[in-house]
A protein has these predicted regions:
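Short, flexible active-site loop motifs that bind/organize anionic cofactors or intermediates
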Residues: 18, 138, 159
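Short, motif-level signal for alpha-helix interfacial/capping segments enriched in acidic residues
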Residues: 81, 143-144
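Short, amphipathic alpha-helical "recognition" segments used to contact nucleic acids or chromatin
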Residues: 128-142
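Short, conserved DNA-binding cores of transcription-related domains
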Residues: 1-121
Length: 172
């Protein structure tokens, strides 16, 4: 098993550390999501409770036994390879803060830190509500999706800066 640690180009202030504190659970999640984006992996929520959250690399785990024999709807292989990278965040009710209780940075797969690849990873595909509203208005006005994408591309500096695809817009 190869162990891949974070890219040496990531500044220490962006790397999660044990006992690192946050005012809210959402703030801790956004911090880890930003780190994942810089490092080149996608994040999934594994376990939750009132006081804790486990956020894992999306390549964590394996297919459940028997699933590999089922007829898939589309022909694609599983991305899950048992990656051990995760963070566990806990709430300290006395101090009214959230903190990283466990941090495992090592991955067992190659990371994809290039912005060109990261923007298509599920946890990083987030659009602003205003953009969704503009696409909805154009769609209701009968503007084809491709034309709407071209207009938005001109307005907002090109598709290379977006974290979504034409298919994402179509599916919204």
């Amino acid at each position: 098993m190869c162990v891949v640690l974070q890219d040496a180009n990531i500044l220490d202030v962006f790397v999660p550390r044990v006992r690192q504190t946050f005012d809210t659970r959402e703030e801790a999640y956004l911090f880890y999501l930003d780190y994942a984006k810089l490092a080149g992996f996608s994040v999934s929520t594994k376990r939750t409770s009132k006081e804790t959250r486990h956020w894992v690399c999306n390549r964590e785990g394996f297919l459940k036994p028997g699933q590999e024999n089922e007829e898939p709807m589309t022909n694609k292989t599983s991305m899950r390879i048992g990656c051990p990278a995760y963070v566990k965040v806990k709430e300290d009710k006395k101090r009214n803060i959230w903190y990283f209780h466990h941090v495992q940075e090592a991955h067992n797969h190659k990371l994809e830190p290039s912005p060109r690849m990261v923007r298509y990873m599920h946890s990083h595909k987030q659009r602003e509500a205003a953009l969704d509203d503009l696409f909805a208005i154009m769609s209701k006005s009968g503007v084809p999706t491709q034309t709407a994408m071209n207009v938005m591309s001109e307005l907002f500096g090109g598709r290379q800066n977006w974290s979504f695809t034409e298919k994402d817009v179509h599916n919204k």
